[in-house]
Amino acid sequence: MKNLLIISILLISLDVFSQEKFETNKQGSEYKFKVLKDLEATDVQDQGRTSTCWSFSSLSFFESEIIRLKNERHNLSEMFIARNAYMGKAENYLRMYGTFTFGPGGAFHDIPWVIKRYGIVPEEVYKGLSYGSATHKHSEMEAVLDAAVKALAKKPQNGKLTPVWKIGIEGILDAYLGELPSDIEDFNFTYQGKEYNPKTFSKSLGLNMDDYISITSFSHHPFYSQFVLEVQDNWAMQSSYNLPLDEFMNVMEQAIMKGYTFAWGADVSEKGFGYRDALAIVPEDESTIQKSGKDSKRFNDAGAIRVSNAFVSPVKERNITQEDRQIAFDNQETTDDHGMHVTGLVEDQNGTKYFIVKNSWGESNDRDGYFFASFPYVKYKTLNIQVHKDVLSKDLKKKLRIK
């Protein structure tokens, strides 16, 4: 009788194992990923030919937060964020006499910066497509805005700025992205049968922008302190909390396991970043990866073509240290390329863990716009993350002086 019981338990265990869900990165791949956690997210979007990944990724993160907090699904307007951030960039640029950053890039904390000041609207209310295109293309608008702020910085009229310079910049943004009233509370719209303006709609979502923090890991500043991450797109000069690498990785892993997604900023120009192959890895021998063509950073094409068996069969990856990470940042091999959204966690047949990453380049690979980023890749090439502060343990909050 005892033997029969043991056999029954073994058979049940085998049946459960055979039914266990495994994923792979692409057709024909030998990678087998066991799903450890797969959190809800809204539909994959396409940023088009724009450098607004920071807006797409952070808003995707906040859309998942709304699902987590209220079990509601909303598609929020990335171009409403980008448009209002442009005004902030223009003002900063001119206050610094044209010596500061002005451009289409941005950072995760720009989204709270905009929402606190202007609110937010659904995508259907403000699509940002007023130039006869079905997809986002900003090269002309970027050129016009750049020329305008550079001209203003020279103060051509009596050596000072006129009171209407902001109206001029707003006029350019109105033309390309769509008009907004000068008082944002006058922008009234109906959504799902209710009347809102951007601020009342923002309030209805149940998000407290003060609950969200940026975290990074670099040794050129003291750990457990805050510092302004030295990347060009950090125009608002906002700070990130600095953690040792192992703790940083633990925060990311525990966030997912606790049910929290996070926005992820990273370098995506490495040989091992194979979006077409739905895989980001750091092979111990990178010479096995052949790369042809040029990476179009931040845009919605997959960049250079990468060919390697490493994308179809697991290979040994580098053991990334804090020093490796710092050297790559200091020598500018690691660059501030792209914002994405981490929504889950998997483990391959060799025990290596990977984050599930939602991109904003449309459903343009075998994973319908998602890919898997190995822990070594994330250790090596992460710039920073945006996450809810309650992901942190009480002890870590105390160390960082977060209430």
Show the residue positions of the predicted features.
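Generic hydrophobic-segment detector
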Residues: 3, 8, 33-36, 43, ...
